[in-house]
UniProtKB/Swiss-Prot annotation:
GO molecular function: structural constituent of ribosome
Gene name for this UniProt entry: rpmC
Protein's UniProt keywords contain Ribonucleoprotein: yes
Family note: Belongs to the universal ribosomal protein uL29 family.
InterPro entries named among the record's database cross-references: Ribosomal_protein_uL29, Ribosomal_uL29, Ribosomal_uL29_CS, Ribosomal_uL29_sf
GO terms for biological process, alphabetical: translation
Protein species of origin: Rhizobium meliloti (strain 1021) (Ensifer meliloti)
N-terminal signal peptide: none
Full protein name: Large ribosomal subunit protein uL29
């Protein structure tokens, strides 16, 4: 997910997307532990998407406060 796409989302949509990605991250880690993971690069993609969403949510909160 690109940063421009994330910036277009509302605060509620950001929370939903974050929850979805955290659930996916959990499932990917579980698959890795059991040896069923096919695309190991997806773990890093999800991790970076989570960081992207958290960063933009924080920026939006700071802008609203200022």
């Amino acid at each position: 997910m690109k940063a421009a796409d994330v910036r277009a989302l509302s605060a509620d949509q950001l929370k939903e997307e974050l929850a979805k990605l955290k659930k996916e991250q959990f499932n990917l880690r579980f698959q890795k532990a059991t040896g069923q993971l096919e695309k190991s690069s997806r773990i890093n993609e999800v991790r970076k998407d989570i960081a992207r969403i958290k960063t933009i949510a924080r920026q939006k909160a700071a802008e609203a406060k200022a």
